[in-house]
UniProtKB/Swiss-Prot annotation:
Compartments, record wording: Cellular thylakoid membrane
GO BP annotations listed: photosynthesis
InterPro entries in UniProt: Globin-like_sf, Phycobilisome_asu/bsu, Phycobilisome_asu/bsu_sf
Induction line: By green light but not by red light.
Binding-site list for (2R,3E)-phycoerythrobilin 1: C82
Record protein name field: C-phycoerythrin alpha chain
UniProt subunit comment: Heterodimer of an alpha and a beta chain.
Residues holding (2R,3E)-phycoerythrobilin 2: C139
Similarity comment: family membership: Belongs to the phycobiliprotein family.
Organism listed in the record: Microchaete diplosiphon
SUPFAM superfamilies associated with the record: Globin-like
Topological category with respect to the lipid bilayer: Peripheral membrane protein
Keywords: Antenna complex, Bile pigment, Chromophore, Electron transport, Membrane, Photosynthesis, Phycobilisome, Thylakoid, Transport
Modification comment: Contains two covalently linked bilin chromophores.
Length: 164
């Protein structure tokens, strides 16, 4: 995978010139976004349990019927699996922040998810609610910088859209 740095250097070299000011600004922007993604990944890692628990609770608050007998969240086992899945999505978002792309979400979270949930009779709306809560609870500068929050929210939106 080529980085912005290698792309800029290759283009300048092919043109027989030094990287221009705009080339260097592009590299600087890429480095700043990478730093913001790493900040968001670190903050999420440090708070994953709290974020996942709050997201799970928000999901159950919006869909209390899930706790009814025979529903998707009616036993302790189902509750644990739902909480585990929410935490799994958040972990994949953290991985995606680190790598700077949606690869981990695409490969380990999104591919085939609708079919699996449909086959198991699991609604996706509660997961959408949980991830939406995680998105809406973030606050700059309380939780992270504005740029880090932008990077984090973009990946949450990506996951939410894939489940919608």
């Amino acid at each position: 995978m080529k980085s912005v740095v290698t792309t800029v250097i290759a283009a300048a070299d092919a043109a027989g010139r030094f990287p221009s000011t705009s080339d260097l600004e592009s590299v600087q922007g890429s480095i700043q976004r990478a730093a913001a993604r790493l900040e968001a990944a670190e903050k999420l890692a440090n708070n994953i349990d709290a974020v996942a628990t709050e997201a799970y609770n928000a999901c159950i608050k919006k869909y209390p019927y899930l706790n009814n007998s025979g529903e998707a969240n009616s036993t302790d086992t189902f509750k644990a699996k739902c909480a585990r899945d929410i935490k799994h999505y958040l972990r994949l978002i953290q991985y995606s922040l680190v790598v700077g792309g949606t690869g981990p979400l695409d490969e380990w979270g999104i591919a085939g998810q609708r079919e699996v949930y449909r086959a198991l009779g699991l609604p996706t709306a509660p997961y959408v609610e949980a991830l939406s809560f995680a998105r809406n609870r973030g606050c700059a500068p309380r939780d992270m910088s504005a740029q880090a929050l932008t990077e984090y929210n973009a990946l949450l939106d990506y996951a939410i859209n894939s489940l919608s």
